[in-house]
């Protein structure tokens, strides 16, 4: 079983599922004209229906947690956009564990909401690269170190001047 786990940007998908099936799907993708296939070193079939047991465990934990109303839009990658009336935070977080990540749609939704700057915090610059491939008008900053934070602060001060 193989599913698309991530729709990262116009030029990149991530598949996940049973290891042998994912390997075979990668071979078939190359035969069909994919430019490259990069096996990811991950510990599970994240963002697929194979994660349903984890989603159920998460749902059980959420039964004892009170969630309030959101005071600003919150976007969920499992739907590629903001939470809507009738949807609940626990429901969407459970979905996020066991369904595809629609990052490209989420980036486009942010652009549609007027977002013009995104700060990526953590190791690597992959998310910033996906933003640049999806919405060229959005500025990105990748922050990994204290020095990066200082550079970000200076850059943002310069934009406000």
Question: Model regions: which residues?
Answer:
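Acyltransferase
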Residues: 1-136, 140-142, 147-150, 154-159
